[in-house]
């Protein structure tokens, strides 16, 4: 895998070409100070919105959760979350233009490993503070920032990356309708059930129809239209049978191979299964009823140090920020 292949899978690189096949999205350049904040281990969240000037009744009635001060014998310091007013306005305008709820991601990754920390246990975001909470809790997002070329074989200097916040219109996608597709030398060699930890009866019953519809979609819209010969793409098959393009990923270890192994994907001649007699038909792997349902691969991400600090009170700054976020959400609901 080469660095150029990783760069080609950035959302803003492929979305303009395949826009009509995918979910409506908005891309916003990520300011350097926002990137620094997301990588900072200090403050957990920010308000994500500008407060109106003047003194309101809520200001007068603010509790210890709203104005927290740390004092010693000689001085007093006020804990204040950082603000990004211009960026916040752009983000909120984009969210509103996409219907009020979005699915956020960076150039490559979404914070799928951090969904559990959100108040709604979902990646559905309506404010910048929702996005910040997920991003600062996600190892996947941190990887985008710090190790995007970790598995690349070329020794050339790492290219300069212009980081972007990607906001996708929120859609209620059924996990059992998502599939990952593996392409080698511009040939679709394998399809895997995306949520392989669960058994879905409809996949078993419709396996041939699913395989053929994805292969047709690939041949009509994707094949020879992506800059690389080897790549991975994700699709969603809706209730009407329409295939939607969700994402592109590099062909290599940085991408989860799901029900395949990377060794067999590289040796594509070794993929054929008993049921697949057509030479040019991709191998389709899915979880069948005989296989024991597996735990979610994201379970290992559910107890980061930030969460332990919150639960034990060892990091007072993060605890106060979390309380502030809850208070802000409650105040907005009452407005």
From Swiss-Prot:
GO molecular function: ATP binding; magnesium ion binding; protein folding chaperone
Positions that bind ATP: 105, 108, 110, 112, 168-171, 178, 180, 194, 234, 247, 249
Domain of life of the native organism: Eukaryota
Recorded GO CC terms: cytoplasm
Subcellular location: Cytoplasm
Residues noted as binding Mg(2+) in the record, renumbered to the chain: 247, 249
Record InterPro entries: CDC123
Record-level GO BP terms: eukaryotic translation initiation factor 2 complex assembly
Keywords, sorted A to Z: ATP-binding, Chaperone, Cytoplasm, Magnesium, Metal-binding, Nucleotide-binding
Predominant subcellular localization, coarse grouping: cytoplasm
Keyword Cytoplasm part of the UniProt annotation: yes
Pfam families: D123
Similarity comment: family membership: Belongs to the CDC123 family.
The protein's role, per its UniProt record: ATP-dependent protein-folding chaperone for the eIF2 complex. Binds to the gamma subunit of the eIF2 complex which allows the subunit to assemble with the alpha and beta subunits.
Annotated protein name in UniProt: Translation initiation factor eIF2 assembly protein
Species annotation: Xenopus tropicalis
